[in-house]
Amino acid sequence: MKGSLIIVGFFVLGIIVGVCDVVPAGLLDGDVSYDVLCCLMFCVGISIGCDTSVLKSFKDVNPRLMMLPVMTILGTLAGCAAASLLLGHRQLTDCLAIGSGFGYYSLSSIFITQYRGPELGTIALLANICREILTLLCAPLLVKYFGKLAPISVGGATTMDTTLPIITRCSGESFIIVSIFHGFCVDFSVPFLVTFFCSL
């Protein structure tokens, strides 16, 4: 949760700096968000390439549980489609793009800002931070009422890093590999799904 609060803090700081009009003009003229996005994608690629032990551990995952990331993605998109019916002022593709962040707020919000503008990018940032915080705070209740896979599915792309400790504590150590596999697959889908829905 500390990491989420730091991200929100920088976001608020950026708003304050923008309102106070103290940003150098040259910085605003350039396509800074695109440059940051390229650097972020490069770092994500490095982290996946360097951690080969994670890829090797996936062979121990129960074949039935390999469907969990697919169910998480489909369930999230179905929920976003339903939400778009209630939010008449938002397009279906906007809601699907936001939901396709799956808790990966840093990457998805930059993509959405790039394609659809800062307003939708801000909504994506806050929505995906809320998903992570919901997992961190409600994991015990999710296990109690919906089963041990529930916090993994709710955690989305965060289950291989920030929410892994709470999932391990609530669901048990036997779900560590499942959680990492789930997070890896959902995480991998984010840039493809977000850009797909943003381009529609």
Model regions: which residues?
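Juxtamembrane boundary at the C-terminal end of a transmembrane helix
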Residues: S189-L200
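Helical membrane-embedded segments and adjacent short helical loop/helix-boundary regions
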Residues: M1-T76, L92-G103
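Entry/N-cap segments of selected transmembrane alpha helices
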Residues: T52-A81, G121-I133, V178-V186
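Alpha-helical transmembrane segments of multipass membrane proteins
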Residues: I15-V19, A78-A82, S108-F111, L137, ...
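C-terminal ends of transmembrane helices
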Residues: V23, I46-S57, A83-S84, I110, ...
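Membrane-interface helix-loop junctions in multi-pass transporters/channels
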Residues: K56-N62, L74, L85-H89, P118, ...
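Alpha-helical transmembrane segments in inner-membrane proteins
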Residues: A81, Q91-L92
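Alpha-helical membrane segments and immediately flanking helix-loop junctions
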Residues: T93-I133, F146-F181
